[in-house]
Amino acid sequence: MAAATVTVEEVRKAQRATGPATVLAIGTATPANCVHQADYPDYYFRITKSEHMTELKEKFKRMCDKSQIRKRYMHLTEEYLAENPNMCAYMAPSLDARQDIVVVEVPKLGKAAAQKAIKEWGQPKSKITHLVFCTTSGVDMPGADYQLTKMLGLRPSVKRLMMYQQGCFAGGTVLRVAKDLAENNRGARVLVVCSEITAVTFRGPSESHLDSMVGQALFGDGAAAVIVGADPDERVERPLFQLVSASQTILPDSEGAIDGHLREVGLTFHLLKDVPGLISKNIERSLEEAFKPLGITDYNSIFWVAHPGGPAILDQVEAKVGLKKERMRATRHVLSEYGNMSSACVLFILDEMRKRSAEDGQATTGEGLDWGVLFGFGPGLTVETVVLHSVPITTGAAITA
C-alpha cells in the first residue's frame, strides 16, 4: 500500500485562498410592473374589494405616506389578481396559486440579475464554482438554485446552496456564506442571488391584523446578484468591495419580534414587538464587536449599507448612533425607489453606492471612505453584520451594470 506524498495540512493550505473575499460584480433586476406609492391605497382597496372599509383605508394611506417609498415593482398585476380573487381576500386558501407564480418567476427574475452580474464580471460562466440562491418567496424541489443552474447553463458540477424562508436579514447571510466559500476554496467564484416576489405575502386588509398591512405598504419585488471571489485577477476582474468579517446574532429579548408562517393562505407576516426599538437598542453592541478590533469608534467615518426594513428603523438607528443624514443616503434611496425587497435590498444598496460614488467623483466605492458596515435585520430578531472595505475608483470603474 503506497504512502501518501502530502499531509492533510498541506492539502488544506493549498485549498485556501490567500486574500479576502471580494465582490467582483453586481447586477439587479425588477419586474416591469411599477406601482407608485401615492396611488397604491386606492388601488389596493379597490382590487381587494375593501373600499367599504373607509377608516382602515385611511390608516393604510397614512402608512404609505409615512413609508418614505416613492415607488415599488410588483409581479402581481391587476389583471392577474382579478383572475385570482382568493389572493385578494384576507385569509382565503391560495397557496397553490401563489406557488404556481413564484416557482417560475423567482428563478426567472434571479436569472435577469445574474446575467447582468456575469456580464459585468466579464468572465466565462464555466468559471463559476458555487451558487448560493436565497428567497423567502415559495419553496420547491429541486429548488430555484437548480432551476437557475439550468437557465444560465452553469456546469452540472457547480456546488449549490439553496436558502429558503430566511427573511429580511438574509442579504447579509449570503455574503457571509459566500465569504467562507471563496476564502476556503482557492480559485472559487461564487454566484450569489437573492430573488424576492411578494406574491406569497399579498392579501387583503384586516382591522385585526394591522402588522400585515404594514407589509402591504412596504414590500416590493426585486432580485440582486453578486460574484464573490478571493485573490482577483486584476487584469480581467475589477474588485468593488472586500468582505472583511461577518457575524450573525439573535438580539436579546426579541423572540417573536418578526414572524412569518407559510400556510394555505400564503406567507403570513407578524410584527409582535417594537422592532425599531430593539434594533436601535442593540446596534452599538454589534458595531463595537465589529469595529473595535479595527480601532474604529467614529461611525460617521464608515459607509453604511443597512437593510431598510422601514423608515422608523433607519430613523432610530441614526439617532442612536448620531449618524449624519448622508451616511444612509444610498439606503434611503433604495427604500424610496424599490421599497423593502427583503434579502435583495442590501445588494441593491451596494450597487447604488458604488455607482453613485463613481458618478460623484469619490475616491473609493464606499462614498470616498475606506471602511463600511452592512447590516441585515429580520426574523428572530436576527442581525447580520458584515464589515466591508472599499476599493479605490479608477476612471470609468464601478459604474458598469
Curated annotation (Swiss-Prot):
<feature type="active site">
    <location>
        <position position="168"/>
    </location>
</feature>
<dbReference type="InterPro" id="IPR016039">
    <property type="entry name" value="Thiolase-like"/>
</dbReference>
<comment type="similarity">
    <text>Belongs to the thiolase-like superfamily. Chalcone/stilbene synthases family.</text>
</comment>
<protein>
    <recommendedName>
        <fullName>Chalcone synthase 4</fullName>
        <ecNumber>2.3.1.74</ecNumber>
    </recommendedName>
</protein>
<dbReference type="GO" id="GO:0016210">
    <property type="term" value="F:naringenin-chalcone synthase activity"/>
</dbReference>
<dbReference type="InterPro" id="IPR018088">
    <property type="entry name" value="Chalcone/stilbene_synthase_AS"/>
</dbReference>
<dbReference type="InterPro" id="IPR001099">
    <property type="entry name" value="Chalcone/stilbene_synt_N"/>
</dbReference>
<comment type="function">
    <text>The primary product of this enzyme is 4,2',4',6'-tetrahydroxychalcone (also termed naringenin-chalcone or chalcone) which can under specific conditions spontaneously isomerize into naringenin.</text>
</comment>
<keyword id="KW-0284">Flavonoid biosynthesis</keyword>
<keyword id="KW-0012">Acyltransferase</keyword>
<dbReference type="InterPro" id="IPR011141">
    <property type="entry name" value="Polyketide_synthase_type-III"/>
</dbReference>
<dbReference type="InterPro" id="IPR012328">
    <property type="entry name" value="Chalcone/stilbene_synt_C"/>
</dbReference>
<dbReference type="Pfam" id="PF02797">
    <property type="entry name" value="Chal_sti_synt_C"/>
</dbReference>
<keyword id="KW-0808">Transferase</keyword>
<dbReference type="GO" id="GO:0009813">
    <property type="term" value="P:flavonoid biosynthetic process"/>
</dbReference>
<comment type="pathway">
    <text>Secondary metabolite biosynthesis; flavonoid biosynthesis.</text>
</comment>
<dbReference type="Pfam" id="PF00195">
    <property type="entry name" value="Chal_sti_synt_N"/>
</dbReference>
